[in-house]
């Protein structure tokens, strides 16, 4: 399956995220739909997994929007803005990003992104 197919079918296609992307550990976008990272955001996202204190204190930027970080560790970063938010999950080679709005429960978005990340980790990605 291509990276774009994972974004289209396993993330956005579930209806539990409205936008998604997969980026490499270098911050470059591998695939995306309804989500566009601005210059430098990918690298800052990847760095947030190494330096959780920076994203906990300064928030996380995705698609030009700042999100209040509500969880950050070396595997997951969750951000909130109003009733929407973002779920970022690191795998061995990539970072999955899911964006949800007020019509989607945060837990639904989190489950979809975390499950795909688990699958990719189990398969060496």
From Swiss-Prot:
One of its GO terms (molecular function) is actin monomer binding. The keyword Cytoplasm applies. InterPro entries: PFN (IPR048278), PFN_euk (IPR005455), PFN_sf (IPR036140), Profilin_CS (IPR027310). CDD domains: PROF (cd00148). Keywords: Acetylation, Actin-binding, Cytoplasm, Cytoskeleton. PROSITE patterns: PROFILIN. It is found in: Cytoplasm, Cytoskeleton. The modification N-acetylserine is found at residue 2. Gene3D superfamilies: Dynein light chain 2a, cytoplasmic (3.30.450.30). GO terms for cellular component: cell cortex; cytoskeleton. The keyword Signal does not apply. Occurs in many kinds of cells as a complex with monomeric actin in a 1:1 ratio. Binds to actin and affects the structure of the cytoskeleton. At high concentrations, profilin prevents the polymerization of actin, whereas it enhances it at low concentrations. By binding to PIP2, it inhibits the formation of IP3 and DG. Belongs to the profilin family. This is Profilin-A. It comes from Physarum polycephalum (Slime mold).
């Amino acid at each position: 399956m291509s990276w774009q197919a994972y974004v289209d079918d396993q993330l956005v296609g579930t209806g539990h995220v409205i936008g998604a992307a997969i980026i490499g550990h270098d911050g470059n976008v591998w695939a995306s739909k309804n989500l566009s990272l601005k210059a430098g955001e990918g690298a800052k996202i990847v760095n947030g997994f190494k330096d959780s204190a920076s994203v906990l204190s300064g928030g996380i930027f995705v698609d030009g929007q700042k999100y209040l970080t509500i969880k950050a560790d070396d595997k997951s970063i969750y951000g909130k803005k109003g009733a929407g938010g973002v779920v970022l999950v690191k795998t061995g080679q990539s970072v999955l990003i899911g964006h949800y709005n007020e019509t989607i429960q945060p837990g639904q978005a989190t489950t979809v992104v975390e499950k795909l990340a688990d699958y990719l980790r189990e398969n060496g990605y």
